[in-house]
């Protein structure tokens, strides 16, 4: 095979070729490392030998040789003693094995003992070799330590002696460490040997108990009783199974003790050991494999219905014809004329052959069975002869399902318990059972006998899938059922796919809506941020705006009243054109301003004339009133004000700026007394210039606003004829407009100081007063001036 480059490779034939190469390389590296370690060990041994030779040349070499000889003798004595102990142990083990061979006739135990003996011998040899090696290392360590001491004691300052002493000390330390490690290994091996002995003792104890049970069973065997032979055969099978299980367990345990590079290793603490549960499962599996299938009654998974609880039940089987049915219970193939099968309810499984006379007597003594037989004869679709018995004593049925996990299995049990029992086979010569006939027989015989089940495995009456094969189904019906199942599978798959697609669509739609919601939230945040920025820019630009300062001199007229827009705009937090603080939206005139003090701009009041005059009116000139030609109908609604003496050139408002171009004189209050019946003008400190009017807007004022909006007038339209007092005194100016009284301020000195004295409506400086027109006429100038007493303005 060739790859994309056109080169042949072995990937298809050797999938683990690269891994094998890596493993080989690793093995080669490990082998090289082992060789290097061996070379280093050889070099160390050579150095030690050289050191020993140099030490022998010392002056105390004779004493050293004597000590070495004594140690060698002690070592030889220890070896001889160990050999004698080994021989004694081997003899004892052989005697013990002979005794066990005499007691244990099986081969498995002998093999176990042999394996145990070999394991013990190996462990003993290893322990002896380890002890001998440890003794040798200890001796060499002692020699090296002695040599080191001798070298250090008799050193004459030579550099060679110092080097020899240091090397000898290092070698002694290494040997002591190896000796300690050997001792630890020996202790671990002894512990593992004890664990193995305990396990083997447990296995041997079980074997001895099993052998004793076998001997007792052999003594109790009786060749005459068939039942005893069957039970003994079962016990022997169990014993053999247990022996095989023990043998396998011991073999598995011995396989754990695997030799690796010639070193016998015992099982570590982390290796899995055999537990009683594993032994039990092994015994069960071997028992299932070794035991033969026995033909036990009621093997099909159901039990015959208990017709009578205490008396015997007999069923007569008169087989006069040889049908092709496969449910025959007799073992012979010829036609039987009178076979009687008697089943005892007390002892199930005992079969006896009785004579026809005994069967007839039992039938006569059991009236219930006679009734049942009568019912059996009256079953429709039954032949003249009775059919075979459906209780299969020898073996299970061949053409019926024996599963109890579905509804069809329960039907089969009722069919076998009912139809065959009462002789309703309905055979038509072809061996096919009639299921409907059997159900009819069961219904006529009794409802209590068709719903029986086994106590061990009760039949479930719930739903469930029917078995794949049924005896009473033709090939056409099976084909139809298969086609129907395939069609149902395809429909279920389509339904699942449709559900999945719908779920995916809904999830996508939800994701889209969530994304849209997030986008809208972001857009709202952006718009709010821009609004805040624009508001901040407007607030920052308002103090320096030249247009706002030019509007301070403009005047708006509403229903005959004057409203300074400059003061309105500066006193209402900078909202010059539109302020949305709860104003009346029913105003039809789009040229009027909306005040933040919740006043109706169509009611004819002076708005915005508040404390802002303190900051704006002091440095500005008086209001400039210019005549503008407007409609005559609107001029009729303008109220003529009396002459204000405070607006002359001697007032305090004229001190800061140039004089106005034109002014108009207002008439006195006395001339308007006959028309001021409903006029209430507050002059006290509590009264405010912002006096709202109650009622609807005048109709004459709203007529001009509906067709088209007009521009806001900047000045008050005053005719020359209105400037004369004689014309004002005539009284042509209306005091009411559509039933709404007109309220105007009283005639007084309305300069800045008088307004600051408490007439601005900010905070009352005295008790509440209700002024009248008479009080206004008698005391027109009761407002305090800065010359008489200080100001009484109270700030919040």
Curated annotation (Swiss-Prot):
Compartments where located: Nucleus
Family: Belongs to the bZIP family. Fos subfamily.
Major localisation: nucleus
Xref: PROSITE patterns: BZIP, BZIP_BASIC
Record note on quaternary structure: Homodimer. Heterodimer with Jra. The kay-Jra heterodimer binds more stably to the AP-1 site than either of the two proteins alone.
SMART domains: BRLZ
Coiled coil ranges: none
CDD domains in the cross-refs: bZIP_Fos (cd14721)
Keyword Nucleus: yes
Annotated spans, Leucine-zipper: 506-534
Protein name: Transcription factor kayak
GO biological processes: embryo development ending in birth or egg hatching
Ranges annotated as biased composition (Low complexity): 402-429
